[in-house]
Amino acid sequence: MSDQDSSTSSTSFPKYLEHLSGDGKAIGVLTSGGDAQGMNAAVRAVVRMGIYTGAKVYFIYEGYQGMVDGGSNIVEAKWECVSSILQVGGTIIGSARCQAFRSREGRLKAACNLVRLGITNLCVIGGDGSLTGANLFRKEWSGLLEELAKNGEIDSDTVKKHAYLNVVGMVGSIDNDFCGTDMTIGTDSALHRIIEVVDAIMTTAQSHQRTFVLEVMGRHCGYLALVSALACGADWVFLPESPPEEGWEEEMCLKLSENRARKKRLNIIIVSEGAIDTQNKPITSEKIKELVVTNLGFDTRVTILGHVQRGGTPSAFDRILASRMGVEAVLALLEATPETPACVVSLRGNQAVRLPLMECVQMTQDVQKAMDERRFDEAVKLRGRSFEGNLNTYKRLAIKEPDDKIPKSNCNVAIINVGAPAAGMNAAVRSAVRVGIAEGHKMFAIYDGFDGLANGQIKEIGWGDVGGWTGQGGSILGTKRTLPGKYLEKIAEQMHSKNINALLIIGGFEAYLGLLELAAARNKHEAFCVPMVMVPATVSNNVPGSDFSIGADTALNTITDTCDRIKQSASGTKRRVFIIETMGGYCGYLANMGGLAAGADAAYIFEEQFDIRDLQSNVMHLTEKMKTSIQRGLVLRNENCSVNYTTDFIYQLYSEEGKGVFDCRKNVLGHMQQGGAPSPFDRNFGTKISAKAMEWISAKLKGSHGTGKKFVSDDSICVLGIQKRDLLFKPVAELRKATDFEHRIPKQQWWLKLRPIMKILAKYEASYDMSDVGKLEPVHNHGELSAI
């Protein structure tokens, strides 16, 4: 099917995986270039999805070197040989740089090794160099086969039968330096390593009043440096794409000394290893240290993170990303025709898309060219909206303009946390406070939710008051589940007396319900006729109007880490099945996505009703599994998935039915899912989305002060969220129709489409709707705001 046919059919009727078959096809999977956490999850997904569709899948060990050497380097993969690799960093099939593949002679050997095994589909996981090599190989394929036939190494029938090579790429790189995708496999895990180090360093730096210069990876791309600076509230950051202006030395020293004068006990400077000045000369960590010591006399230390960033366990985000990419790569290979160009599977917002490989490579090379030619503004733009947005947000939050330079709006904006605590709430508050002050507003903090608002617990909050909040879990302002309904009179009175001109609510489903109650009370209380916006923050990820909520990623990582430990325990014991109960209310997001990230055998959720036959089927599936070399099982259950099929019931059923085959244990994770330091994703998501919310408030308030203007329209009371690739302000009046109030969940949930992936990778038959995929998209088709 051509690309055009594929796009037509996807709009005319649902397209299901059952329509695709891999019978008679062979797929080769290799990892090339620098390793990245999450590569194993991608390999696992390719192997299992390929086998599921009926194709043969081959491991190509040691990257292109293994392809050139052949022999025992190209081995057929079995279902069980990718078990227990999700939680392992690096790549189990090895990666190596290969000079031989750069020559035609080397590629001729590689073609011979592949065609003898019937491999005409290649899935390459690597950086732009690896993907460029794969595309060249694809172009030369028919010529290479003809040459092999002429040399008598293969016959003419083999040339006809395997005339075309299909290539699909997945970008595995911790640097996130590939244009066209919001996130490359490994980047989120590398950010986890950096933030773990920064959090650890902060305690020692505070003890001694030290300045730390942290050098992070990224030779030609400053993404890791920029996002980690945003995530830890660094004082200064050096990037290759955005060199500091002339005289930066004095400006940086002034900023550091001002921060120290505000009683800040530590300074953090983050340097990308490829940092340069405007003359393209390197800026090294040692040079920065020397500068700080000489000019300020501060006790300064340098920490070079190095290969620590490539190591460790992949984050939940990387496992889910890589699993989705791997499945999509197999589908792209099976749908490919001789006319289909080589494509790369990418992430846009929360959607997996296919992009023309060479267009992405060209754009990536254009960034480097722009930097070499000192066209730095263009280089930042070419990196994409996400990078540019991160840079602008960092600049706004890191450096405070002098008070006399900030135009006063004479507006008072209040911030409140509502609902259960969620990691990342404090980052969101910090961002809102600083952006609000930069916009000229007076910012007020409301303590202890709507209870606190009714009781007048409202204080002005300044720029320095929120320093160091980004990395702190929970809610510093205090949060309660109380709704405003019973306090409407008091709340209106407090808002009127404090002259509150706008309200930013950060919280979960209770915050959404509270917003609805305030909207309904506008006709009675004039104090509520002000712009109000809600930023979703809940581990449950159940707020209508947004695909993601602040805190859900941190909870997902907690679940994934716990499941890894439990699986290890089960592997040691043998023949053991664990039942894990997750939070989320009636929303199955944590159970489903946790199951995908941890490699669970099943996940029971409220959104997909199940009965005793399904439980019986799962028990039989686990019984069969115990006959293989993988003698353990993992089952996740959302806390409210069923009134009668409780965790205890499922545990007892499995224990009874598995008697003599496997034994069973249960584990209720509980409130540990709400705690801990926020993940890099939640810190940055909270920071960016709150900044956008404050910009919206400023736009609404512009010119309204002193006019007595009342905000009564639906579009002045909104929920801000990401949907697919776009950042949207949705009026709560509109969202009411999209809400299941009884069960506190949205009526439509995007992640349910990923449910079949979890089932397929756990060896179940599943119907996978491919209607949303299959189209090759242009590289420049970007949404408003990418996932961080």
Curated annotation (Swiss-Prot):
Q: Where is this region: N-terminal catalytic PFK domain 1?
A: 1-399
- Give the main EC class: transferase
Q: Which GO terms describe its molecular function?
A: 6-phosphofructokinase activity; ATP binding; fructose-6-phosphate binding; identical protein binding; metal ion binding; protein-containing complex binding
**Tissues expressing the protein:** Expressed at high level in neuroendocrine tissues.
Q: Provide the positions where the record notes the PTM N6-acetyllysine.
A: K395, K486, K688
Chain residues that bind substrate: S173, I174, D175, R210, M217, G218, R219, E273, R301, H307, V308, Q309, R310
Task: List positions binding ATP.
Answer: G34, R97, C98, G127, D128, G129, S130
Q: Which residues carry this modification: Phosphotyrosine?
A: Y651
Under Enzyme Commission nomenclature, its number is: 2.7.1.11
Pathway where it operates: Carbohydrate degradation; glycolysis; D-glyceraldehyde 3-phosphate and glycerone phosphate from D-glucose: step 3/4
- Keyword Glycoprotein in the entry? The reply is yes
* Entry-linked SUPFAM superfamilies: Phosphofructokinase
Q: List the disulfide bonds.
A: none
Q: Which GO terms describe its cellular component?
A: 6-phosphofructokinase complex; cytoplasm; cytosol; membrane
Mark the residues carrying the PTM Phosphoserine. Answer: S2, S6, S12, S21, S142, S386
Q: What does this protein do?
A: Catalyzes the phosphorylation of D-fructose 6-phosphate to fructose 1,6-bisphosphate by ATP, the first committing step of glycolysis.
Say which family it is in. Answer: Belongs to the phosphofructokinase type A (PFKA) family. ATP-dependent PFK group I subfamily. Eukaryotic two domain clade 'E' sub-subfamily.
Q: What is this protein called?
A: ATP-dependent 6-phosphofructokinase, platelet type
The organism named in the record is: Rattus norvegicus
Protein encoded by which gene: Pfkp
